[in-house]
Structure formats: structure tokens, C-alpha cells
């Protein structure tokens, strides 16, 4: 039987979604040049064995076994698991959550998913968090995952319950967050009949998940749940969706199910492929180490991928300090380096620091670790990193892209060298390869960077006594009063100008201490994310920095905070406008503020109605005192700060411009 056994007959799209991608993974395996191939793609081989062994619920899978010499060694006899016999699909779901060590589930009940909710009723094994909207369940699960480094689990009903989670699913895909979403579905006999609350979730979620499937037989449920957790966390993490028809979760399993092996045996050819890939990686690492000997102006650019392994930021910091290489980050990479270090360039990109943007444009060697090179960090791609491209042509530098996802490499920026695989493992190899090489002096380069730091600081015009406080002042005061406890602080944000002020005026020192929506930019993310982060780390001080417009999209989750007594701190910068959009309208649309201002409720009274303590700051001179009270309050608390309008976010790289063509605050112009 061939390893690359073609699928000859599949009866459903769900089956193709599952098995077609597994076969694709196997084909991908044979072209890998990464030593992490088995760890990353073992799943595909494992599932291919399953295809060969079983006649599954979707149809018979046949394979041509007469034309191949690349075979898997004979498998041992199949064993069977009878532990689920006599249990309903809902009860099997409960047991599978225990198997995967799930401690918390976020979601909302409904008719199509009631067999599962009945099975987990009063379960002592995990806690269920009930928000006021399914979107909030998804964002809370995202934050839970970002803090714990485990997949977040969402459980919702069919139809609108499931479609309400699509935004968090898309957000999780953009930011590489492992999310396992279980959606209820109408009974299999009613599928396609436009039944009440029926929605084609496999079709709807296909473009925003790594993998999705509808379970059509209760016997398939354990296997599908195992696959969901495996796929969500393997390679570049992301969301998966498992659709659960009501009759499947209500039916009882009557026969034992096969116990499937998790790791296949490999023949000699497979082992040769892996050994060849390992040699290729070693050769690439050696070439990069040689470029580090030649480079005079290197920069490290790190993204969210660096935070995937808790040990990677520590290694990165030691590596950059030993080789004296300055480090900049993406928005989602904030916290990977201690921004109090002289080697920190802070955030890169459209609203990043002027000195990070200048350094990226002038660098002759860029080590890009776990990044996507999205448009917010590159500016005009054709004008991005000109000196590194020149150095690459002269074989003395270039752009080196380290990433676990092959599709991210070369998608936006063509690298000089691509190191595909786990970023932490690759960085360990590079660290080892550079231990005994002679590194040139970085004195001139670091001096130039210091000059840029003095010339292009983050700045703003402070408010006068009696005036509304400036939003940047609020972030600086928060930074000041948490400076000694940052190892205990986790911050979430909504999306908008407040998000950028938090990124640039707060000094990030702890890995994964910022939980925000990066790639999709989802307004309303902040409060539900704070709920999820606090559930994940109840001893941490979790602060949601939010704007009034963003907060208003999910503000009803204050009721969730109160119901579960979640000790989040909510800081609202209220300027009664959509600040990021009004900035564009001011600069490029002749101040035509089309529908970007709104009247807000009294947030203090709103919080009070929910049973949550609330404070308000209206003048600059009250800020420090109220901030201290805000931070020292036990339990949930909300502080509304009335801030000045038309405060823009600077620096700012306009669309179509290069990174070094940024607009500065008027005080620096």
C-alpha cells in the first residue's frame, strides 16, 4: 500500500476537508528541508494509516498497492476501546475534554447542542464560562489560549450561535491562535432542508479555519476530537471547527471503536528524506552564521512566532545581547524583548518607532523570526529594506526568514535564506553555530541607532492644568504605576488609536503580556479577551485598555464579569470618536468626519448597574490618584477617562510610502 495513497472515493466535502488535507501534508513532507518534519507532519502520516485501516463513515477509501516500493511496515493488529460503549455523544464529548486536559470552556447553549450541555451539567472537571454573546466566547477563548499556550475551547449551538463565532475564528486564523470550536447542528436527517437554525458551518468556516469537519456517526466522535486538538496545535497554530449534529450527540455508542496508532513506522526512504532535510537546515544555518560575521548593521525582527515557545524569548534576549544586535518587534511580538534594554527598538511599522523603521531600512542583515511581513510592518513592499537587498546581491547580508509555516515564507518579502521549522529550534541551532565565530564591532551601528532614538522619540503635547487629559498621558501613568509589578500584569486591548498608544507608550517587558487583535483588527476584542486572560491566569492583574467605540461593541460582557466575579480592570479612553478613522479623515479627506463620532452612555453608571465599581477622570490633576485607586481595587473595576479629541497616533507611515517616510508629531517636524 503506498504512502501517498490517492483518495478514490469521498462522499462529503467534510471528508475531503479532513482527509484531502492529510494527503497534502504527506506530499508536503517529501519536499521538506526541515529537521522538524516528523514533529510537524507526523499527524498526516498517522491519519493516512487510519485511512488505510478503516472503512469510515464517509465511504470506502481505496489505494493502489501494486505500483509502489515506498511502504509502511506492517502494522500490529488493531485494538479496540470499549470505554465509550453505552455512552451518548454528549458524554463522550465530556470524556474527551478530560482526555485533552481542558479546564475551561467558553460558549452559549441552544437546542441543537443540548445533549452536550446536559452531559457536562455540573461537571466537576472543568468550568464553563457563559458570556452574553458567542463572539465574546470566541475572543475569551483566544485570550485564554494566548496566556496558557493551550487551545481555547468554544461550545455553541447551531445557526446564529455558530455564525456569531466566525469573527473570532477568523481573528484566530490571522494571529495563529489555536482554537477548537464545537458547533451544534440540526439532526443529520434534516441537513439541507433549511431546518430551524440550520447553517452550513463546514462551508461557512472553510476559509477561516485550518480544518473543519461534520461528525456524522457517534463512533467517529473521539477520533474527530483528537484530530481537532492535534491540527489546531500543530505547525502554525490556528482554529478548527467540529460540527456536531444533534442526533450524533444524543445517540448511544453500541460497539467498541478502534484504537489507532499515533506514529507510523517509517521505511528507509522516509528516513533518508529526513536526514537530507536535516543536512539542508544545518547548511543554511552555517550560511546565516557566516553572514553574521560579515554584517555591520544587523537587525532582529521578531513576531508572534517567537512567543509560541515560552523558552524562545529568553534565548532571543541572550542571543541579541551576546551578538549586540538590536531587536524590533511586530505588534503581536511585543514582550519578546525587554523594551527597557538599549538594544530594543520597540515596535516596527505604520505606527512603530521612527528609529525601528530607519534601522530596518538601513540594515544590511535582517533576521526575521516568526513574522508574516504583513503590510503594517513593511510599508511599500517594493521600497522595503533596500540596504539588506543590496547586501544580499553582494553576498554580505540579506533577509533571513525563520517561520514554521511554509506559506508565509516568500508570500510578501522574498528572503535571501528561508529557515522553515520551529523558530525556537532554529534559533538554538543558530545560537550554537555562532558561539565560536568572531563578530565585528557594532559600535558605529549602535551609535547611529541611538542618534535616531534621540531624534525620533515617541512624543505628544501634554495637556494643561484643568484640561482633558491626553490619552498618551493615561498610558504613561499606567506604565509608571505598574513598573514594579509588570511580571504580574497582562494587558488586553480593543482595536483603534488606544491600541497603538498602548503599544507605544507602555514599556513591554514580559513575554505574552499583551493580548490584542493583530491581523484582523477586531474592535470589541478587549473586554472578552480580558475575561479569558483572567480565567487563564487568575492571580495576574489583567487590564483591558479600551477605546469608547471598541468597548461599546462588547460592553455587555460587564455582566459576565460580574456573574463570574472575574477581577478584570477596565480602562476606557473616552473621546466620543473613532480616533484611528478620524485621523485618516483629517489627513486625507479634508476633515470630512463621516459617521465617526458617537454619543456614549455614562460608562460609570453602566458599570454601577452591573454591580461593578467605577471611577471617572475628567482632569489631568486627578489622573495619578485615580489610577492608584484603580490598580489597588480588589475585584472588577472600571475607570473611564475623558480624553482630548483629535489626538493622532504618531509616527505614521501613510499608505504607499516606505518605512522611512513617516510623519512625525508636530513638535518634531
Curated annotation (Swiss-Prot):
Organism for this UniProt entry: Schizosaccharomyces pombe (strain 972 / ATCC 24843) (Fission yeast)
EC code(s) of this entry: 2.2.1.6
Catalytic activity: 2 pyruvate + H(+) = (2S)-2-acetolactate + CO2
Protein name (Swiss-Prot/TrEMBL): Acetolactate synthase, mitochondrial
Family: Belongs to the TPP enzyme family.
Binding site for thiamine diphosphate: 134
Entry's Gene Ontology cellular component terms: acetolactate synthase complex; mitochondrial matrix; mitochondrion
Segments of this protein annotated with the region Thiamine pyrophosphate binding: 497-577
Amino acid at each position: 500500500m503506498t504512502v501517498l495513497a490517492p483518495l478514490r472515493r469521498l462522499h462529503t466535502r467534510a471528508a475531503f476537508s479532513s482527509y484531502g488535507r492529510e494527503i497534502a501534508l504527506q506530499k508536503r513532507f517529501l519536499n521538506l528541508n526541515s529537521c522538524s518534519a516528523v514533529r510537524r507532519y507526523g499527524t498526516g502520516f498517522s491519519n493516512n494509516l487510519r485511512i488505510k485501516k478503516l472503512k469510515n463513515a464517509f465511504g470506502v477509501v481505496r489505494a493502489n498497492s501494486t505500483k509502489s516500493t515506498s511502504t509502511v511496515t506492517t502494522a500490529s493488529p488493531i485494538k479496540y476501546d470499549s470505554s465509550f460503549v453505552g455512552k451518548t455523544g454528549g458524554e463522550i464529548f465530556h470524556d474527551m475534554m478530560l482526555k485533552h486536559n481542558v479546564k475551561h470552556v467558553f460558549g452559549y447553549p441552544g437546542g441543537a447542542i443540548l445533549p452536550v450541555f446536559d452531559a457536562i451539567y455540573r461537571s466537576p472537571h472543568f468550568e464553563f464560562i457563559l458570556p452574553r454573546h458567542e463572539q465574546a466566547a470566541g475572543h475569551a477563548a483566544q485570550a485564554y489560549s494566548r496566556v496558557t499556550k493551550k487551545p481555547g475551547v468554544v461550545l455553541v449551538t447551531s445557526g446564529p450561535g455558530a455564525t456569531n463565532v466566525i469573527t473570532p475564528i477568523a481573528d484566530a486564523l490571522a494571529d495563529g491562535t489555536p482554537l477548537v470550536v464545537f458547533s451544534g447542528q440540526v439532526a443529520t436527517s434534516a441537513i439541507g432542508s433549511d431546518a430551524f437554525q440550520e447553517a452550513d458551518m463546514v462551508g461557512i468556516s472553510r476559509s477561516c479555519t485550518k480544518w473543519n469537519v461534520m461528525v456524522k456517526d457517534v463512533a467517529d466522535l473521539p477520533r474527530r476530537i483528537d484530530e481537532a486538538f492535534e491540527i489546531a496545535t500543530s505547525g502554525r497554530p490556528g482554529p478548527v471547527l467540529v460540527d456536531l449534529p444533534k442526533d450524533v450527540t444524543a445517540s448511544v455508542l453500541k460497539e467498541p471503536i478502534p484504537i489507532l496508532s499515533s506514529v507510523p513506522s517509517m521505511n528507509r526512504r522516509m528516513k533518508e528524506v529526513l536526514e537530507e532535510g536535516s543536512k539542508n537546515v544545518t547548511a543554511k544555518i552555517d550560511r546565516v552564521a557566516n553572514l553574521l560575521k560579515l554584517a555591520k548593521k544587523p537587525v532582529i525582527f521578531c513576531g508572534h512566532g517567537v512567543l509560541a515557545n515560552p523558552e524562545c524569548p529568553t534565548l532571543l534576549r541572550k542571543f541579541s545581547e551576546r551578538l549586540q544586535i538590536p531587536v524590533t518587534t511586530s505588534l503581536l511580538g511585543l514582550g519578546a524583548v525587554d523594551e527597557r534594554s538599549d538594544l530594543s527598538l520597540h515596535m516596527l511599522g505604520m505606527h512603530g518607532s521612527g528609529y525601528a523603521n530607519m534601522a530596518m531600512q538601513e540594515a544590511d542583515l535582517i533576521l526575521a523570526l516568526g513574522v508574516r511581513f504583513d503590510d503594517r510592518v513593511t510599508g511599500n513592499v517594493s521600497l522595503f529594506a533596500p540596504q539588506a537587498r543590496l547586501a544580499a546581491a553582494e553576498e554580505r547580508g540579506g533577509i533571513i526568514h525563520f517561520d514554521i509555516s511554509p506559506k508565509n515564507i516568500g508570500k510578501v518579502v522574498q528572503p535571501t535564506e528561508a529557515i522553515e521549522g520551529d523558530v525556537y529550534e532554529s534559533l538554538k541551532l543558530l545560537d550554537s553555530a555562532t558561539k565560536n565565530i568572531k563578530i565585528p564591532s557594532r559600535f558605529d551601528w549602535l551609535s547611529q541607532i541611538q542618534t535616531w532614538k534621540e531624534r525620533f522619540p515617541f512624543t505628544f503635547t501634554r495637556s494643561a492644568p484643568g484640561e482633558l487629559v491626553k490619552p498618551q498621558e493615561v498610558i504613561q501613568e499606567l506604565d509608571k504605576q505598574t513598573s514594579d509589578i509588570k511580571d504580574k500584569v497582562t494587558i488586553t486591548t480593543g482595536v483603534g488609536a488606544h491600541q497603538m498608544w498602548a503599544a507605544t507608550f507602555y514599556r513591554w517587558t514580559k513575554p505574552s503580556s499583551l493580548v490584542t487583535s493583530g491581523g484582523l483588527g477586531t474592535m470589541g476584542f478587549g473586554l472578552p479577551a480580558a475575561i479569558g486572560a483572567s480565567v487563564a491566569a487568575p492571580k495576574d492583574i489583567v487590564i483591558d485598555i479600551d477605546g469608547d467605540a471598541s468597548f461599546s461593541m462588547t460592553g455587555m460582557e460587564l455582566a459576565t464579569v460580574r456573574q463570574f466575579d472575574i477581577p478584570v480592570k477596565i480602562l476606557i479612553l473616552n473621546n466620543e470618536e473613532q480616533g484611528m478613522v478620524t485621523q485618516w479623515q483629517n489627513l486625507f479627506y479634508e476633515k470630512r468626519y463621516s459617521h465617526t463620532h458617537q454619543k456614549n452612555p455614562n460608562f460609570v453608571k453602566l458599570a454601577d448597574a452591573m454591580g461593578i465599581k467605577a471611577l471617572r477622570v475628567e482632569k489631568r490633576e486627578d489622573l495619578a490618584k485615580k489610577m492608584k485607586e484603580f490598580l489597588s481595587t480588589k475585584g472588577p473595576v472600571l475607570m473611564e477617562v475623558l480624553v482630548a479629541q483629535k489626538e493622532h497616533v504618531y509616527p505614521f507611515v501613510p499608505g504607499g510610502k516606505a518605512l522611512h517616510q513617516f510623519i512625525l508629531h508636530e513638535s518634531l517636524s
